[in-house]
């Protein structure tokens, strides 16, 4: 106990000294770099952006420094959210808004971000302290509350609509990294009402699968368009939690899902590559399914239905482009003075014999190959002589 008290006193002393230096505008710790006003592509050990700026030199990103103009809100600073915030900070995002009401616990140490000495701190406070040390160029705004309560929900909507890099402007993207459906539905409602593009992410309860999803209100399916069973059945998810039972958590799956999410964010903000509307991950089979989901006209969210109607009007007002008909040019062969002809080595009868029946399929679907009908193998049938192996060997020696 005395040792613990001494450690806590030492920590308090360090924090008091750090607070004193911050108030005096001094550098808090040795080794902390000063802020960088302009990103540079100069390849030197002291440049934290040289590897990122190399993306422009290699033709991947047209203007990487544009990332400093964007604001991203991360809701949920847990296994996925904390790693997502760290990746965006290292990438040099302009501003991060962090929302979470939970505290750091020792049970969180199997994740990739928090450290044991941060136990007891709010997750947003611990995250801001670590992230600010990683990259002082990024602006941070943290909110330690539950967004699903009435008062906090209104404040949450206010911040994502006015908390951009330039105060009074909306954020560029909202990232849902929460672990419960109630919070997801709150984010979904807010973004539908504000017409705010957002990305949803999640990891399964058994920790071996996850997904990310880009949601554009009115254009793609929102979270309420195709809700999980627990939401569609109006089940209180709190009743599903049993005492002494918790969801599994693998740092590997958390890292993979966070990586997919941030990669999609970068492609969306910096306009390179193909942005995925839905990307899944199955760790058991290393399977990455992709798809795009259309909105549900009977969605339970009235703001989603409203945005669907407005999107249809925009599409109808857009000038229609005439389909470009490509005229096939006739192939003109040169004179064949030698009379050379290309003849297939396989006859039509052989091709027909090597192919099997084609099943009836819906329009637009074709089989990659068919399996030929196998015929019984013709040949001699050897009768069973009921002789032992030794007797057969003796007969062979006498031949």
UniProtKB/Swiss-Prot annotation:
| InterPro entries cross-referenced by the UniProt entry | D-isomer_DH_CS1 (IPR029752), ThiF/MoeB/HesA (IPR045886), ThiF_NAD_FAD-bd (IPR000594), Ubiquitin-activating_enz (IPR035985)
Keywords recorded for this protein, A-Z: ATP-binding, Cytoplasm, Endoplasmic reticulum, Golgi apparatus, Membrane, Metal-binding, Nucleotide-binding, Nucleus, Ubl conjugation pathway, Zinc
Q: Where in the cell is it found?
A: Cytoplasm; Nucleus; Endoplasmic reticulum membrane; Golgi apparatus
Q: Which CDD domains match?
A: ThiF_MoeB_HesA_family (cd00757)
The answer to keyword Ribonucleoprotein applying to this record is: no
Pfam short name (any one): ThiF
Domain of life of the source: Eukaryota
Q: Where is this motif: UFM1-interacting sequence (UIS)?
A: 331-343
Q: Summarize where ATP binds, as residue positions.
A: 79, 100, 123, 146, 180
Q: Where is this motif: UFC1-binding sequence (UFC)?
A: 384-399
Where does it sit, as one GO cellular component term?
Golgi apparatus
Annotated active site residues, numbered on this chain, are 246
Alphabetically, the GO molecular function entries are: ATP binding; protein homodimerization activity; UFM1 activating enzyme activity; zinc ion binding
Q: Where is this region: Linker?
A: 344-374
Provide the residue positions that the database annotates as binding Zn(2+). Answer: 222, 225, 299, 304
What are its GO biological-process terms?
A: erythrocyte differentiation; megakaryocyte differentiation; protein K69-linked ufmylation; protein ufmylation; response to endoplasmic reticulum stress; reticulophagy; swimming
Q: Its biological function?
A: E1-like enzyme which specifically catalyzes the first step in ufmylation. Activates ufm1 by first adenylating its C-terminal glycine residue with ATP, and thereafter linking this residue to the side chain of a cysteine residue in E1, yielding a ufm1-E1 thioester and free AMP. Activates ufm1 via a trans-binding mechanism, in which ufm1 interacts with distinct sites in both subunits of the uba5 homodimer. Trans-binding also promotes stabilization of the uba5 homodimer, and enhances ATP-binding. Transfer of ufm1 from uba5 to the E2-like enzyme UFC1 also takes place using a trans mechanism.
Free-text note regarding domains: The UFC1-binding sequence (UFC) motif mediates interaction with UFC1.
Q: What family does the database annotate?
A: Belongs to the ubiquitin-activating E1 family. UBA5 subfamily.
Stored PANTHER family: UBIQUITIN-ACTIVATING ENZYME E1, UBIQUITIN-LIKE MODIFIER-ACTIVATING ENZYME 5
Q: How does it assemble?
A: Homodimer; homodimerization is required for ufm1 activation. Interacts (via UIS motif) with ufm1; binds ufm1 via a trans-binding mechanism in which ufm1 interacts with distinct sites in both subunits of the uba5 homodimer. Interacts (via C-terminus) with ufc1.
- What protein name does the entry list? Ubiquitin-like modifier-activating enzyme 5
| Designated gene of the protein | uba5
């Amino acid at each position: 106990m005395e040792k613990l008290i001494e450690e806590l006193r030492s920590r308090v002393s360090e924090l008091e000294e750090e607070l004193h230096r911050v108030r005096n505008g001094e550098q808090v710790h040795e080794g902390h770099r000063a802020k960088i006003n302009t990103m540079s592509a100069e390849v030197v050990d002291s440049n934290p952006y040289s590897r990122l700026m190399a993306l422009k030199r290699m033709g991947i990103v047209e203007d990487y420094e544009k990332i400093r103009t964007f604001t991203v809100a991360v809701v949920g600073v847990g296994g996925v959210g904390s790693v997502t915030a760290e990746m965006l900070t290292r990438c040099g995002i302009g501003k991060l808004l962090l929302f979470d009401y939970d505290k750091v616990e020792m049970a969180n140490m199997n994740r990739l971000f928090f450290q044991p000495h941060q136990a007891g701190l709010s997750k947003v406070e611990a995250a801001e302290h670590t992230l600010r040390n990683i990259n002082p160029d990024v602006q941070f705004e943290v909110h330690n509350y539950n967004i699903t309560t009435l008062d906090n929900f209104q404040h949450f909507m206010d911040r994502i609509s006015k908390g951009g890099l330039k105060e009074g402007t909306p954020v560029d993207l909202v990232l849902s990294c929460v672990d419960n459906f109630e919070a997801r539905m709150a984010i979904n409602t807010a973004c539908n009402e504000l017409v705010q593009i957002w990305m949803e992410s999640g990891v399964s309860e058994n920790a071996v699968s996850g997904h990310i999803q880009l949601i554009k209100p009115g254009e793609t399916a929102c979270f309420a368009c195709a809700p999980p069973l627990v939401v569609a059945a109006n089940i209180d998810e709190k009743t599903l939690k049993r005492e002494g039972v918790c969801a599994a958590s693998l740092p590997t799956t958390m890292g993979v899902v966070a990586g997919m999410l941030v990669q999609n964010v970068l492609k969306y903000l910096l306009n390179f590559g193909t942005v995925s509307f839905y990307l899944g991950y199955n760790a058991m089979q290393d399977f990455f399914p992709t798809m795009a989901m259309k909105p549900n006209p009977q969605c339970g969210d009235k703001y989603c239905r409203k945005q669907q109607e407005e999107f249809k009007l925009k599409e109808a007002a857009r000038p229609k482009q005439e389909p470009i008909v490509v005229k096939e040019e006739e192939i003109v062969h040169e004179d064949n003075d030698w009379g050379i002809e290309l003849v297939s080595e396989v006859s039509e009868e052989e091709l027909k014999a090597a192919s099997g029946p084609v099943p009836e399929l819906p329009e637009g679907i074709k089989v990659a190959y068919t399996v030929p009908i196998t015929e019984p193998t013709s040949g001699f049938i050897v009768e069973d002589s009921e002789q032992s192996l030794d007797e057969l060997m003796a007969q062979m020696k006498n031949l």
